[in-house]
């Protein structure tokens, strides 16, 4: 996985919009790369400049210096590179300089380095010797400890091939990862 055209918009707000290249030659990876790049373009098009809005400067909660960003969708990547597996973490959300950080959503895509294909949750469970009962117990424990409802989950492998579970939860007021 590599990136081009970084398109750094704001250093202070850590906003950049790179083009991702998965460098895996199968339809699944090509389709994912195309989808992610389209989403990145859409996020970049969401930028609203501070000079285009009328706000009280005292409402700004971020240190932005002289940068001219009021709000924007963000879209970021992180790679978890293990011996046999490669997981792409995609984080996205919306930033507004007059509000504390909003919800950030996460998606994970785990590839087998041997085959180049995305792994399903079933394949990930098998690799990590994780059962459906293990997942049910983890969900129940998390929901009970945090007084939330897990709306959905996604399994992925970290760089050490440990099975991890990304959860989308609802606490009765907001939904978040």
Task: Outline where the language-model segments fall.
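Compositionally biased intrinsically disordered regions enriched in Thr/Gly
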Residues: 1-177
């Amino acid at each position: 996985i590599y990136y081009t055209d970084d398109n750094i918009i704001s250093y202070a707000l850590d906003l950049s919009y790179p083009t991702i290249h998965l460098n895996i030659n199968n339809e699944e990876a090509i389709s994912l790369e195309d989808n992610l790049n389209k989403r990145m373009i859409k996020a970049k098009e969401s930028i609203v400049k501070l000079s285009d809005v009328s706000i009280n400067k005292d409402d700004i909660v971020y240190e932005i210096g002289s940068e001219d960003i009021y709000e924007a969708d963000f879209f970021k990547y992180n790679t978890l590179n293990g011996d046999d597996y490669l997981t792409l973490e995609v984080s996205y959300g919306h930033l507004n300089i007059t509000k504390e950080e909003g919800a950030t959503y996460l998606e994970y895509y785990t590839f087998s380095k041997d085959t180049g294909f995305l792994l399903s949750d079933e394949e990930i469970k098998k690799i990590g010797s994780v059962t459906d009962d293990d997942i049910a117990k983890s969900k129940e424990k998390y929901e009970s400890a945090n007084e939330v409802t897990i709306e959905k989950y996604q399994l992925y492998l970290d760089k050490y091939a440990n099975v991890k579970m990304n959860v989308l939860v609802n606490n009765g007021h907001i939904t978040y990862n």
